[in-house]
A protein has these predicted regions:
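Short alpha-helix boundary/capping and kink motifs at helix termini
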Residues: 1-112
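Charged/polar, low-hydrophobicity segments characteristic of intrinsically disordered regions
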Residues: 2-7, 156-163
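Sequence-level detector for tyrosine residue identity
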Residues: 16, 21, 40, 68, ...
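Generic hydrophobic, helix-prone segments enriched in Leu/Val/Ile
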Residues: 48-49, 66-81, 129, 140-145, ...
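A short, basic-hydrophobic beta/loop patch
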Residues: 97-159
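C-terminal interaction module
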Residues: 164-255
Length: 255
């Protein structure tokens, strides 16, 4: 199976395989952390924007990179079942390999989905289905926990989705995060810092730290308020900001 997945990764042609993905824990920055429950939507591969990196994936940037690193241990013995799983309704079905006891589980903010459980099988599914002409490029009826957009970031994401601003983020840890919004010459720095145990929606809100104009004032602000320089922040692609604001996955989903 490892050779089959590597061959698929070599030959598959799909733009989403070569887009840099975002770490799932970083995408959670943009969530309201208020679960709307578990649903079973059909999620197009195009809508999957994040994985959680394991140690063996630490140098990987894209889905294709990650597929090459898979060990596929125990997959050969269940090859027929594994390939059938890739193109079947997933729901609460376990991956048919010894040691994999839980269903593939996604989280979604709006229409932007990211992997919560199944970070090995998902890249394999992506490259194999993209390579195989008779397989669909969609996660069929996949278990998915749905969240809304962090209300304090809604207006910011709307600006970015329209191309009227650029958003950068820095994830210190689960309790300390930063957002930088640039609109022309103006910049605004936001921070969310909460204490252990806080879990209300408002506890995840971002609050303005400072704002100004021109790069020189931004550098001063970063020295005073940010733990790292701007070069350590990551930019959120406009495409993902648009997905955050969508709602088609929820409309298409069955509880």
């Amino acid at each position: 199976m490892k050779k089959i997945i590597e061959q698929a990764a070599d030959r598959a042609v799909a733009e989403y395989l070569d887009r840099p993905y975002i770490l799932s824990r970083e995408l959670a920055i943009f969530s309201d952390h208020q679960s709307k429950g578990d649903f079973y939507p059909n999620i197009p591969f195009e809508n999957v924007v994040g994985l959680e990196k394991r140690n063996e994936f630490k140098d990987c940037v894209t889905i294709r990179d990650t597929a090459y690193r898979l060990h596929c241990e125990g997959w050969d013995e269940r090859k027929t079942e594994v390939l059938a799983y890739f193109n079947s309704p997933l729901r609460d079905n376990e991956f048919p390999v010894t040691g994999s006891r839980k269903p593939l589980t996604m989280h979604a903010i709006g229409d932007a989905a990211y992997c919560f459980l199944g970070n090995h099988r998902l890249p394999a599914m992506f490259v194999y289905n993209a390579y195989s002409s008779n397989f669909d490029e969609v996660l069929k009826e996949v278990k998915c926990t749905k969240y809304g957009v962090n209300e304090s970031l809604f207006e910011i994401l709307t600006l970015v989705s329209k191309g009227e601003g650029r958003l950068y983020y820095y994830h210190v840890d689960s309790y300390d995060k930063f957002i930088l919004l640039e609109t022309g010459l103006r910049w605004t720095l936001y921070r969310n810092k909460r204490s252990l145990g806080q879990s209300d929606k408002e506890d995840f809100y971002f609050h303005k730290v400072c704002s100004g104009f021109f790069e020189w004032s931004q550098k001063i602000a970063f020295c005073l308020f940010s733990p790292v320089p701007k070069s350590s922040y990551k930019e959120l692609p406009q495409r993902i900001s648009r997905l955050f604001l969508g709602d088609s996955l929820l409309n298409d989903a069955e509880e």
